[in-house]
Curated annotation (Swiss-Prot):
NCBIfam families membership: PRK02565.1 (NF002722)
Transmembrane segments: 8-28
Major place of residence: plastid
Protein name as it appears in the record: Photosystem II reaction center protein J
Compartments reported by the entry: Plastid, Chloroplast thylakoid membrane
GO biological process: photosynthesis
Subunit and partners: PSII is composed of 1 copy each of membrane proteins PsbA, PsbB, PsbC, PsbD, PsbE, PsbF, PsbH, PsbI, PsbJ, PsbK, PsbL, PsbM, PsbT, PsbX, PsbY, PsbZ, Psb30/Ycf12, at least 3 peripheral proteins of the oxygen-evolving complex and a large number of cofactors. It forms dimeric complexes.
SUPFAM superfamilies in the cross-refs: Photosystem II reaction center protein J, PsbJ
InterPro entries: PSII_PsbJ, PSII_PsbJ_sf
Source organism per UniProt: Triticum aestivum
């Protein structure tokens, strides 16, 4: 598993993608709930 030179592990891609999606969805719903989502 140490031969990842030039290749990004799928687990890392999945983790980053998951965090990004959860963060964006969380911010979107939080903004909408706070009343600031209409400006987006």
């Amino acid at each position: 598993m140490s031969d990842t030179t030039g290749r990004i592990p799928l687990c890392l891609i999945g983790t980053v993608a998951g965090i990004a999606v959860i963060g964006l969805v969380g911010v979107f719903f939080y903004g909408s709930y706070s009343g600031l989502g209409s400006s987006l």
